[in-house]
Amino acid sequence: MKALRSSSRLSRWREWAAPLWVGCNFSAWMRLLIRNRFAVHHSRWHFAVLYTFLSMVNSCLGLWQKIVFGRRVAETVIADPPIFIVGHWRTGTTLLHELLVVDDRHTGPTGYECLAPHHFLLTEWFAPYVEFLVSKHRAMDNMDLSLHHPQEDEFVWCMQGLPSPYLTIAFPNRPPQYEEYLDLEQVAPRELEIWKRTLFRFVQQVYFRRRKTVILKNPTHSFRIKVLLEVFPQAKFIHIVRDPYVVYPSTIHLHKALYRIHGLQQPTFDGLDDKVVSTYVDLYRKLDEGRELVDPTRFYELRYEDLIGDPEGQLRRLYQHLGLGDFECYLPRLRQYLADHADYKTNSYQLTVEQRAIVDEHWGEIIDRYGYDRHTPEPARLRPAVGG
C-alpha cells in the first residue's frame, strides 16, 4: 500500500512538473508567454511560476557554458557529416533512431541535450538526478522514455527562444506558431542564417562531446532538405514511411497527448484533423523536392513494416547503401536491442468509414506509391533477429 501511495505521488508530481519547457532560457520563456498574451489556463499557473524561475537559472548556466566551452566548441571540426532521419510523425523515426545509435560509432542527441542545449556540456552529469521527473514511457505510445534516450533536435530552437512550429504545443488554442519555419522558404535571410548557425552549433556540441557520427531524427526536417544541405553538403538522409491508415489516427493521438500534457491551456483540438491531413500532403511534397537535391548514394528509403518484419536484413541493406561501415561490428549490439524489445507492442487504431475515406482521398498517392494494401493492417511486434 505504501508503495502504491508513493507511485501515485510520483505520478502526480510528473503531471505537475511536465518537463518539456523546463529547459527554456529566460528570453525563450518570456517570448513564449508574451507572444501568446500570457493566455495560461488557471490549472497551469504553476508552470508559469516554476519555469520563470528555472528559465533564469538556465540563462545563467548558458552564459557559463559559453565562457567555459564556447571557444573549444567553435574550433571543433565535424569530421563525419551527420545523418538525418526524415519522414512523417508516427512513421517509426524514433525506432529507427534508437536502432542506429545502438552502433557505438554513432550517437544521437539525448533528451537532456535537446532540452538543455545551452548548458548540457556543463550540466549533463546532473541529468540522472532529475530523471524522476520523466515518465518511463512516452505519452503517445509504449516506447521507453528518459533523459538519456535520443530525442528530436527541434526542441533546441524552442529552448533558446528561436522560432519553431513546436511552440504551438504550449498554446494549442492559439493560432499555429511559426508555420513558415517548417520549410523555411519564407524566412528572412537574417533569421535563416540564425537558424542554420543554431543547427550547426548544436551538432558541433554533440560531436565535441562524443566524437561520433551524429544522427538527427526530426520529422520537421523532412520539409528542409534544401537548407540542411546548405549547412551540411555531405549529409546523408534516411526516409522511413509507414501505412497511412495507421499514421493518420496515430498522429492525431500524438497531438492530443502532447497538447494535454505539455500545453499551458486546456486544448480544444479545433481543426486538428484537417491540419494533420494538410501537413502530411505538404511534407511529402517538400520531401520529394528535397530528395532530388541529394546524391542517390546518400539517400535511403525504407518502409516501417519491412523494418519491423526483418530489422537485421533491412539495416544491413541500409548500411551497405550509405556506406556506414562494417555491419558485423554493429550486429551483436543490434541483436541485443531487438531481444530486449521483443515484447514491444504498438498501439492499435480503428478508423471509421469517414476517416478511411479521408485518407483515401488525400493520401492515396502515397498509399499507391509505397505499395500499401488498402485493407491489410501492419504487424504490431518488433521481430527479433534470428540466425546469421
UniProtKB/Swiss-Prot annotation:
Catalytic activity field: omega-hydroxy-beta-dihydromenaquinone-9 + 3'-phosphoadenylyl sulfate = omega-sulfo-beta-dihydromenaquinone-9 + adenosine 3',5'-bisphosphate + H(+)
Family: Belongs to the Stf3 family.
Phenotype upon gene inactivation: Deletion mutant does not synthesize SMK and shows a hypervirulent phenotype in the mouse model of infection. Mutant has significantly higher levels of menaquinone-9 (MK-9), an essential component in the electron-transport chain in M.tuberculosis.
Molecular function (Gene Ontology), one example: sulfotransferase activity
Gene Ontology biological-process entries: sulfolipid biosynthetic process
Pfam families per the UniProt record, alphabetical: Sulfotransfer_3
UniProt keyword Transferase present: yes
Domain of life: Bacteria
Entry EC number(s): 2.8.2.40
First-tier enzyme category under EC: transferase
InterPro entries: P-loop_NTPase (IPR027417), Stf3_sulfotransferase (IPR052736)
Free-text function comment from the UniProt entry: Involved in the biosynthesis of sulfomenaquinone (SMK, initially named S881 on the basis of its mass), which is localized in the outer envelope of M.tuberculosis and negatively regulates its virulence. Catalyzes the transfer of a sulfonate group from 3'-phosphoadenosine-5'-phosphosulfate (PAPS) to omega-hydroxy-beta-dihydromenaquinone-9, generating omega-sulfo-beta-dihydromenaquinone-9 (sulfomenaquinone).
Protein name: Omega-hydroxy-beta-dihydromenaquinone-9 sulfotransferase Stf3
SUPFAM superfamilies for this protein: P-loop containing nucleoside triphosphate hydrolases
Keywords: Transferase
The keyword Transferase appears for this protein: yes
